[in-house]
Amino acid sequence: MRQSLHGLLRYCVNRKSYKACWLPPYVDDKAVVTKKKRIGYPLTDSQIIRLLESLPDDEIGNKWKFACQLMAVYGLRPEDLRHLHTRNKGKELWSGYEKSKGGRKGETTEARRLFPLLVSDGDELIDWNLLGRFQIKEPLPSLGKEGKAGESIGTYLRRKLVWKQLQQEAESEGQQLTAYSFRHRYSAECHARGLQPKQIADSMGHDLETHMNSYARFMSKDLESAFDAANKPKGKIAA
């Protein structure tokens, strides 16, 4: 009975545009018996720029820069990098990666159109012309065996001094820096720039329930400023 009700509520939110507050509580049976899930660190835009500027300006370094830029701007999973293609006469970038939906028999995610969220340098947005560079087949680095792209990216970056510094910055906040931290940046920035959770979930290639379970923490990052604004006087009260 409970599973049926949960399924109905998820359907209403994911397919019928009901508000996210109707989602049932997320329960992961595996989490009860396994170790605590690590908290993924979202890279900031300034950290991404710092990292990219530190990578070597040579053939190999430029391939990895391109990969990092794509992951940050489009919110890619590392494995998405293998499955990129264009549609609509080259005007749209898509990922054809089909990821298993954990716990759901045989279900996988569908191909999705990718939407850029540009990295900012202060008040200016940086356009790295990623779609154009992909169209002319700018090379990406070797990503190893299928399903191991995250490990390949991590192996390369862990050798770099700036990445080690960023790891320490993440650990100081009780979080973990991984190859997915570029994707976490995308989610955090989408929330910060005012996109709706369902829009962000669709662009990242998962359903709203999964998104809320993984990224709801980014929805409350601006609590301090929100309460500061709420406590500002709206005007003088007449005596």
Task: Give names to the regions the model predicted.
Residues 114-175, 180-182, 186:
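Active-site/catalytic core of tyrosine-dependent DNA strand-transfer enzymes
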Residues 42, 99-103, 204-228:
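Catalytic-site neighborhood detector that most strongly recognizes the C-terminal catalytic loop/helix
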